[in-house]
Amino acid sequence: MCDHSLPRRRYYFHLKDPGSAITHFIGLALSVLSMPALLIHGAGEGYSRMQMAALSVFLLSMVGLYAASTAYHSFDLEKGRNRILKKLDHIMIFFLIAGTYTPICLTTLAGKGGEGLLLAVWAVALGGLVLKLFWVYHPKWLSSVLYIGMGWLCLTKLPTIWAAMPRPGFWWLLAGGVFYTIGGVLYALRLERLNTLHPHFGSHEIFHLFVMAGTACQYVTMFYL
């Protein structure tokens, strides 16, 4: 016989930042689902082991960024653990940028200075890692400057990229850079008037959408290396 005098337990999960968590969870799901297509494409093109590994670095950095962001915006933890998730979230941005460069430098720019550019990009990524580990609450504009500057290091090889990459790939690459840049500027400015749009959808969520658009464009670029 059931004892109805006992209180019922209710189990629910509370998202810390619903809009941000949901947008990048969608990004995470799409990232995971998109992995096989790019790997199959690379194998079909006869990519070397190094080039396949480079594609894998890009894909893993993409999944890593959206997983870290989803976790940070989902879990409302105590201060110390929340700080760890925040560090991971921000560090993965550097890794995604460097991860995006990796297949481009080792495929399109292989033997054309791509290796040097790749070393420079990963050096900045490791510098960003150190910055985020030891100065978590630095000014947001500083992060944006580093992200955008790192992203546009490719301008040093622009003529080579233009000559070596098929036109559709070049324009997708450029579009991705523009989306990321707009997102980075919005992140730095933190426009308060955008936070009045909806209780759970404001400037940070709009930043997330621009990041997702940038990732989508540069994912397509990988089919034109």
Can you describe what each PLM-predicted range is?
Residues M1-L225:
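Multi-pass alpha-helical transmembrane bundles in non-GPCR membrane proteins
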